[in-house]
């Protein structure tokens, strides 16, 4: 390999940090927000809706930033995303700190929080595709897959570190706002280092950035079982106009219909589970009257779930060589099993085991569904299929978490019945609609 055909380790570490900090910060926030909402006296559903607004903006803006990352200015796009994360996290932390100290009422606090959070939804999605494109444009074919896999793994690792660090960052004086302050500082340090140490764009190879979902869990942005089913990324046409050489790929396409339906059902099951788990722990552990004590338990459960997800993606799928249909089927089957201890467990151990089983299932399901949709269409349609899959993944986090929390608040059984029904529905789809063999790499469109 030519000496210039790879990224120096220090630059790779910086790009890794860009992705790691945003993923860890978001999942750390998830660990403390149920407790903060309880302190503020806000209905649980409004806390979930504050996330939903940001998720909607992310889904709408991510394709735009991904297109921008295809051009020069990737360093600027990374800086924009990190600056948005740092500013949004700082404003969210200040708003919640003021609300907890009586400066604002509960309703005003959560509305201002949602507005501050929208900055991340609008601009935060600029970083991931820019990082991907930067790496792809500076690495040769031999190193590219490994480098992109390392970048993608930083998101997953961040979802483990965030919940693990959150309880340790709850310090005197700041309390539950500690994680917001800490990750704002981390983001600023990464941003300054990025501006000073990362060279401006001078790409040696063509490189593209992908639309990525917001990092709500370790399986938000799964790696494909087979990253390039039609060959190496260098064999794909460069800068091909959207929909060139064929009709626009539709959601109703018979080749995609079953995969997308399974993706919608499984994605909504996962988002409901993630939306409810923090409030479930507050109730089952009897911590509504001392919510500060719940942050550690919530962080532990989320961390165990993230580890289980990464075990599936980094260990089980490659070791067992599971195909898309098998990954999807087994993943949703494990979700059906794990929902039972979640719905019935009364102690931290049982709830953690149930959540880990479900997360293991989602770790199998997400890559299976994603690669199944990719392999179902031809080479020239890969970009369109990836966009549709990204939309399916993102749409699950817009209203489903809030609906799940609303159902849970009306009856502690309703949310779990819905999750179980969605998972069973996905299993039925796998059995009935995914019997046709997927195309092989030799069957190019």
Say what each PLM segment does:
Residues 5-55, 258-262, 267-288:
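Helix-loop boundary and gating motifs at the non-cytosolic
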Residues 20, 101-126, 350-364:
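Hydrophobic core of transmembrane alpha-helices in multi-pass small-molecule transporters
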Residues 116-155:
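Cytoplasmic helix-loop-helix junction between adjacent transmembrane helices
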Residues 177-195, 415-432:
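Symmetry-related core transmembrane helices of the 12-TM Major Facilitator Superfamily/SLC fold
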Residues 1-9, 199-261:
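Juxtamembrane intracellular "pre-TM" segments in multi-pass secondary transporters
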Residues 83-106, 334-346:
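C-terminal ends and interior cores of transmembrane alpha-helices
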């Amino acid at each position: 390999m030519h000496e210039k055909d790879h990224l120096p380790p220090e630059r790779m570490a910086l790009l890794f940090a860009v992705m790691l900090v945003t993923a860890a910060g978001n999942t750390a926030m998830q660990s403390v927000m149920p407790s903060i909402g309880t302190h503020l006296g806000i209905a649980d559903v409004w806390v979930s809706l504050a996330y939903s607004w940001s998720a909607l903006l992310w889904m709408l803006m991510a394709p735009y930033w991904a297109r921008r990352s295809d051009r020069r200015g990737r360093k600027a796009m990374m800086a924009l995303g990190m600056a948005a994360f740092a500013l949004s996290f700082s404003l969210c932390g200040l708003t919640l700190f003021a609300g907890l100290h009586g400066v604002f009422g509960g309703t005003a606090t959560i509305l201002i929080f949602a507005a501050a959070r929208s900055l991340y939804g609008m601009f935060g999605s600029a970083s991931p595709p820019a990082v991907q494109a930067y790496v792809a444009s500076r690495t040769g074919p031999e190193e590219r897959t490994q480098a992109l896999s390392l970048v993608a793994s930083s998101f997953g690792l961040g979802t483990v570190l965030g919940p693990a660090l959150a309880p340790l960052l709850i310090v005197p004086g700041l309390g539950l706002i500690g994680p917001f302050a800490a990750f704002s500082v981390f983001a600023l340090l990464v941003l300054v280092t990025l501006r000073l140490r990362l060279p401006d764009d001078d790409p040696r190879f063509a490189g593209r950035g992908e639309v990525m979902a917001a990092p709500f869990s370790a399986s938000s942005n799964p790696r494909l079982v087979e990253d390039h089913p039609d060959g190496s990324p260098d064999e794909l046409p460069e800068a091909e106009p959207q929909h060139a050489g064929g009709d626009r790929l539709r959601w109703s396409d018979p080749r995609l219909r079953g995969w997308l339906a399974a993706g919608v059902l499984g994605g909504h099951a996962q988002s409901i589970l993630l939306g409810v788990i923090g409030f479930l722990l507050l109730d089952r552990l009897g911590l509504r009257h001392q919510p500060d004590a719940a942050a550690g338990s919530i962080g532990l459960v989320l961390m165990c779930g993230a580890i289980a997800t990464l075990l599936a993606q980094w260990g089980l799928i490659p070791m067992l060589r599971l195909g898309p249909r098998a990954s999807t089927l087994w993943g949703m089957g494990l979700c059906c099993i794990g929902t039972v201890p979640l719905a019935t467990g009364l102690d931290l151990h049982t709830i953690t085991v149930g959540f880990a089983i479900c997360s293991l299932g989602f770790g199998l399901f997400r890559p299976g569904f994603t690669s199944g949709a990719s392999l179902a269409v031809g080479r020239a349609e890969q970009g369109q299929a990836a966009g549709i899959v990204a939309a399916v993944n993102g749409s699950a986090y817009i209203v489903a978490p809030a609906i799940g929390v609303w159902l849970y608040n009306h009856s502690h059984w309703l949310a779990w019945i819905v999750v179980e029904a969605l998972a069973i529905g996905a299993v039925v789809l796998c059995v009935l609609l995914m019997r046709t063999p997927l195309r092989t790499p030799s069957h190019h469109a």
